[in-house]
Every structure is written in structure tokens, then in C-alpha cells.
């Protein structure tokens, strides 16, 4: 029998050493014990996989950019090598996302009780995020399918958060941040993205007195990111340059 506390301890240690693959493996094992995760464990799982997938997303962007430049050069051998390397990174990225989505569907979302709104929103947001990461690299029908799954998870989380969480709650704000990025970058719907981000920001500003002392720093940081994105997206719409949001 694997000791749960030892696994969590290993994840904490791996995080300090910035060994995120080890951290993710430890938290995957904790999740597969099929017991509800504490807030700390939930965050450890999220941080681990965000770093594991983040490294692949970053590599994929770099190689995709090189691939576009190489295609323009017309060197067939080099084009083939770059394409093969992009596909390798893509497969790794897809495997990580699938890992997380399986944990969410088979354990985490499934085991949330009706009234565990915070956990439910946290995990549904995560589900939306990982389908969004798949959408970044997918094409054609495959892309349409993962985009739809991402939208569905974000939308469900959004409804629950509006009904059961304070507008200043960091999880509700974080969801609005990522959902709006989904509209802007994946759906190419800047108006919806701006509307969602602005509403979340304004609602939080209107209820600043409800800010929990423990989450003050988290909430205000996300509000700042929402505002930064709004500024960027509004200026992008004016000069139509396109651009990436914070996520």
C-alpha cells in the first residue's frame, strides 16, 4: 500500500527541485488512490501538470514558428525534420493532456459531491484548460471536437461559479481569465472575450469588501491580469494586430 502522505511529501520536494514530471507522477498516484484531494493537494496537482504541459506548449510554439520559416526556405530535408520534431512534441503534449483529463473524469470531477462547488469549478476549469491546450495544436475535425469539449467544461464551471461563489473568489476570477482567453485565442471571438473579462473585473471591483484576507493576493493578481488582457485586446481590436493574452 502506497503511503499517501509520502507521495504528497515527494510532490512538495519535487516542486522545490523544479522536477515537475516527478511532481506530476506523485500527484497522479495520490489522485488514483480515489480519495478527495485537500486544497493543498489540488494545488500541487495543478501546478505540477501546468509546468509539465507548459514546457511542451512553449516548445511547440518555438518549433511551429521555425517550421513556418523553414517552409518558406523550401529545403525539403530540413522541412521534414522540423515537422517530425513538432509532431513528437505534439504527441507528448497530447499524452500529458489526456493524462490530466482521465484523472479529472475518472476521479476528481466524478467524486465531487453536489455541494462541493469550489472543487467542482476548480476541476471543470482544469478540464476546459487541458482541452484548450489540445485545441492549440489540433486541426480539422479533431480541433472542432476538443474546442467543443473545452467550451462545455468552461461554461458549466462558469454557471456554477456565478451562482455559488463570490465575484472576488480567486477560483471564479481565474476561471473568467482562462475562459476569456479561450474566446480570444481559440474561438477568435474578441468581443465575447472582452465582455467576459470586463464583467468579471467589474463584478469583483464592486465587491472588493468581500475580499478574503487569505486570498487577497491571488484575487488582486488575477484582476490585474484580466485588466492587462482587456487593455491588450482592446488595442488589438483597434489596430487589428492580434495578440496573446495572459493565461
From Swiss-Prot:
Superkingdom: Eukaryota
Name of one Pfam family that matches: 14-3-3
Signal among keywords: no
Principal location class: cytoplasm
Site for Interaction with phosphoserine on interacting protein, residues: 57, 132
Subcellular location: Cytoplasm
GO biological process per UniProt: protein localization; signal transduction
SS bond list: none
Subunit structure: Homodimer, and heterodimer with other family members.
PANTHER family (UniProt xref): 14-3-3 PROTEIN (PTHR18860)
Family: Belongs to the 14-3-3 family.
Biological role stated in the UniProt entry: Adapter protein implicated in the regulation of a large spectrum of both general and specialized signaling pathways. Binds to a large number of partners, usually by recognition of a phosphoserine or phosphothreonine motif. Binding generally results in the modulation of the activity of the binding partner.
Protein name as it appears in the record: 14-3-3 protein gamma-B
Organism the protein comes from: Xenopus laevis
